[in-house]
């Protein structure tokens, strides 16, 4: 997965990225890399405004995912409740992170009335840490899942009270979720998307927000991220991201 090198500490355009271990192709760690790179450039070039833009981009691509989930559920006559939210998720752990032993490890500590889930191992956290970017990871994760849920159904109350980047686990709480220990939380396979798709969704959401806010300088941020991506993952994977330029991520495509 790109060239091995020194761990990044903030932005280092001419450097390399140290992965947890070598794996080729799109996966959770590549997805985290995209977010980390946008955080690097946005905060270095624009300071606090850049951080706010990063949060806005995170919320955009997360809400887009949630809306696609909701559209599939509505098509199938499902209620937009938290059980359906679980079943219509768009990803499952890749073989790459399973081989590395860093696939998500979670534990439900409360089923009701509030559903509480804790995450103890996460490949996104591992990637942010390997890049020396735990603050970027914390900002990303405190806004991601609650935004996916908001895109799915804004009337569900989803809270992220701590993240693995600063604590021993992430804590996710959904108020009055209506969940039970025997609730089916398995993913419906027809809604799963590849990590190539998810990485492209992330890249183009951040790119759209960066350009809208910072105009030509925002376009330069996207170009810098893409250049780093091609350096670390190769032209073929960078070209794969580019082919999604005109995709409407707000709607289901099948």
Give the location of each predicted region:
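N-terminal accessory segment detector
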Residues: 1-114, 123-143, 150, 156-169, ...
